[in-house]
Amino acid sequence: MDQTNLLTLEQELKLAIYKQKIYTLNVYNMKQHLRDILKQMMIKENTIKYFIKNSIT
């Protein structure tokens, strides 16, 4: 079995904490939180692309 796509124990714990926090949010706050997370993911993706591009050239 490929282990690269599995979460670490620390990641599983963080996910459980996020689930608990999400259940307490109302719809507006949930949407706002989702937008913030998506923005963070896009920034992370851009950072990874930047480092990959600059490490090859």
Swiss-Prot record:
| InterPro entries with a match to the protein in the record | NblA (IPR007574), NblA_sf (IPR036904)
Is-annotated flag, keyword Thylakoid? no
Question: Where does it mainly reside?
Answer: plastid
Q: Where in the cell is it found?
A: Plastid, Chloroplast
Q: Name one Pfam family in it.
A: NblA
So which domain of life are we looking at? Eukaryota
Sorted alphabetically, which keywords does the UniProt record give?
A: Chloroplast, Plastid
The answer to whether UniProt assigns keyword Plastid to this entry is: yes
Instruction: Tell me the disulfide pairings in this chain.
Output: none
Q: Can you quote a single GO CC term? A: chloroplast
Q: Which family does it belong to?
A: Belongs to the ycf18/nblA family.
Protein name, per record: Uncharacterized protein ycf18
Q: Which gene encodes it?
A: ycf18
